[in-house]
Amino acid sequence: KTFELDLVSGVVSKGYNCDESVRPLMFSKVEQISSVDESVYFGGYLLNMGKCPVSIYKRDSTDKWKVVYTFPQDTINHVHTLVSDPYRDCLWIFTGDFDEASAIWKVTDNFKTVERVCCNDQKYRSCVVFALPEGLLYATDSPFSDGFIYLMNPADYSVRAIAPIDGSCIYGCQWKDKYVFSTTVEGDGRNLSKMEFLFGRKRGVGIKNDFVHMYCGNLQDGFKEIYKEKKDRMPFYTFQFGVFKFPAGLNISNSLYFQPIATNKNDLKLMELCE
C-alpha cells in the first residue's frame, strides 16, 4: 500500500492499493510545465522479467490515484523516475532494466504523446535525473557496466560523460547549486539461481568495490567523492543493497542529511555532512 501522512494532524491515511506487486521506487512532483498536469506521480516498480504492462499513476487526492498511461506488454520491466523539465516544457520518464527496456521517454500533451527517444543501452538506465538548462544530468544505474554521470543533450539526444563513478546509482539529491549521487553495492541482477538470489554476495562487474560512495558537484566545478562507507557482510537480495538515501526535494541548508543502509558502520542512522 501507499500511505500519506498529514504533517499537521499527524494522521496516516488508510492507504492506496496499487496493482499486484507494484510499488513506487520514488515519487515525482511534476510542476512548472504546461504540457503535463501538476501533481505527484509515480511509475510502477516491480521485478517483471516478463515485461508485463506497467502503468504511471497520478495523485488526485488523499489515497486516490489514477492511471494516466500504461506501457504495453513487452516494453519495459519497470519505471525508475519521472522528471519535470521546465526548460523544454516536457516530462521525461526513465525506465529499466534490460535491453530495449533501458530507455528514456519524452512526454507531452498530458501523456497523449509518449515518445521513446533513447533505448537499448545501459547508459540510458538511470534513477536519479536533474533537468538543467544544458540538458539532463543523471547517473547510471547498471550493476554490470561501468558507471558514469552523464549529460544528455535534448536537442539530439547525445550523451556526454561528465565523471566516472564506482557503481550503480539509485539515490541522489540536489544540495543548493550542487548535485549529489550515491553508488550502490549490489549483485549483477541477471540469471541468478535461487541460492544466488537468496545468499549471493558477488558484486556486479560495474560495482568496483565494497564501498558505498557519495559524489557531489555540478557542471561548472566537476564532481568529487565526499564520503564513503563499507557494505556490511549480509547478502544483497535477502537483506539490502548498500546505499545512502536522501530526503526528497531541494536542500538549501548548509547540511546534507542522509541515511546509510546495509553498511557496517552507520546502518540506519541519520547522518549529517556540513559545508
Predicted regions mapped to residue ranges:
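Structural motif
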Residues: K1-E4, M49-Y57, D99-K106, F144-M152, ...
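Short loop/turn segments that connect beta-strands within beta-propeller blades
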Residues: D6-G10, D60-K64, T108-K112, M152-D156, ...
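A short beta-strand motif characteristic of beta-propeller blades
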Residues: V11-D19, W65-P72, T113-C119, S158-A163
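Repeated scaffold domains used in trafficking and secretory/extracellular systems
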Residues: S21-I33, T75-V83, C119-P133, A163-K178, ...
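Short coil/turn segments that connect the beta-strands within blades of beta-propeller domains
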Residues: D37-E38, Y87-D89, P133-G135, K176-Y179, ...
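Residue-level signature of beta-propeller blades and closely related beta-rich strand-turn architectures
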Residues: G44-N48, F71, G96-F98, S142-P143, ...
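Loop/turn-rich, solvent-exposed surfaces of beta-rich toroidal or solenoidal domains
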Residues: E134-G147, A163-G242
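Blade-level signature of beta-propeller repeat domains, shared across WD40, Kelch, NHL, RCC1
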Residues: F241-E275
